[in-house]
């Protein structure tokens, strides 16, 4: 069972899209195992986006992600990484598939509404960065056998 981090970034929160994103992921069959509405600290932002340090957009990215609250979530399910990334759409909203969150609501890459882990390894690392074990809930739904083999 894979776990993945999903962030609804400040633009998604400000536009009132938290419920829309959660609904799409739940309809997809994924299970929410952790969630918190939070203001991102400078330290957390710099750790999360360390891979981009030194790139021209880094300072703006850090300023943006710390500018307003985000909704941080951990989701779980078979193939959760791929399922979430499909549901969110390509990083650039203009290249995202119709029906994806970014296609339906985004216009620019700098305001692309969400972040989603891009690999199983990054999913594990990012969930651990944003959540303590005590903040994650292991549970099952009665309908899980109808979704998962």
Q: Predicted segments — roles?
A:
Residues 1-149:
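Non-catalytic terminal and connector segments of soluble metabolic enzymes
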């Amino acid at each position: 069972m894979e776990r993945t981090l999903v962030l609804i970034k400040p633009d998604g929160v400000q536009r009132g899209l938290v419920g829309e994103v959660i609904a799409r992921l739940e309809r997809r069959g994924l299970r929410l195992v952790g969630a918190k509405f939070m203001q991102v600290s400078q330290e957390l932002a710099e750790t999360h986006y360390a891979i981009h340090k030194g790139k021209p957009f880094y300072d703006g990215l850090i300023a943006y992600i710390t500018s307003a609250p985000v909704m941080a979530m951990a989701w779980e399910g078979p193939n959760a990484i791929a399922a979430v990334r499909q549901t969110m759409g390509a990083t650039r909203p203009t290249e995202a598939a119709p029906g994806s969150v970014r296609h339906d609501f985004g216009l620019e890459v700098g305001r692309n509404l969400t972040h989603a882990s891009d690999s199983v390894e990054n999913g594990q690392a990012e969930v651990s960065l944003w959540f303590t074990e005590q903040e994650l809930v292991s549970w099952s739904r009665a309908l899980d056998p109808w979704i998962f083999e």
